[in-house]
Amino acid sequence: MAPALRSLLSPRTLLLLLLSLALLGARAEPATGSAVPAQSRPCVDCHAFEFMQRALQDLRKTAYSLDARTETLLLQAERRALCACWPAGR
């Protein structure tokens, strides 16, 4: 066997590998008794729905505000264009 392969298969390395696997396996087990019953958990869907309702209301307000601002700017532009057509002496 090659020296590098022999050092990988040494009893010390194998023991360390087995201990690491055992510790990782023990940590991955779920804790017993820590489950929260469904009745006492917050309704995630309800909270998400309320959040989306508020976000939609905010978007509607923003859209209305932008629409009103656009209308104002268009009226100002039309007024400027109309006033530019009239001679200053009239």
UniProtKB/Swiss-Prot annotation:
Give GO BP annotations, semicolon-separated. 3'-UTR-mediated mRNA stabilization; spermatogenesis
* Reported tissue expression: Expression is enriched in both male and female reproductive organs, including the testis, epididymis, seminal vesicles, coagulating glands, ovary and uterus, and in various non-reproductive organs such as brain, thymus and liver. In testis, expressed in both germ cells and Sertoli cells. Also expressed at low levels in the kidney. Expressed during neocortex and cerebellum development.
Give the observed phenotype of the deletion mutant.
Answer: Deficient males are sterile, whereas females are fertile. Deficient mice display defective sperm migration from the uterus into the oviduct and poor sperm binding to the egg zona pellucida. Mice are infertile because of deficient epididymal differentiation and deficient sperm maturation. Suppression of renal fibrosis in chronic kidney disease models.
Subcellular localization is given as:
Secreted; Cytoplasm, Perinuclear region
Would I find Oxidoreductase among this entry's keywords? no
Q: Which UniProt keywords apply?
A: Cytoplasm, RNA-binding, Secreted, Signal
Query: Which Pfam families does this one have?
Result: Neuropep_like
Q: Give the family from UniProt.
A: Belongs to the NICOL family.
Miscellaneous comment text of the record: Up-regulated in kidney and serum in an experimental model of chronic kidney disease (CKD) and enhances renal fibrosis so may have promise as a biomarker of renal fibrosis and as a therapeutic agent for CKD.
Question: Briefly, what is this protein's role?
Answer: mRNA-binding protein which interacts with a range of target mRNAs including SERPINE1, ACTA2, CCN2 and COL4A1 and may promote extracellular matrix production. Binds to the 3'-UTR of SERPINE1 mRNA and stabilizes the mRNA, possibly by competing for binding with SERBP1 and preventing SERBP1-mediated mRNA degradation. Also binds to the 3'-UTR of ACTA2. Testis-derived lumicrine factor that triggers epididymal differentiation and sperm maturation.
Q: What is this protein called?
A: NELL2-interacting cell ontogeny regulator 1
This protein's gene is called: Nicol1
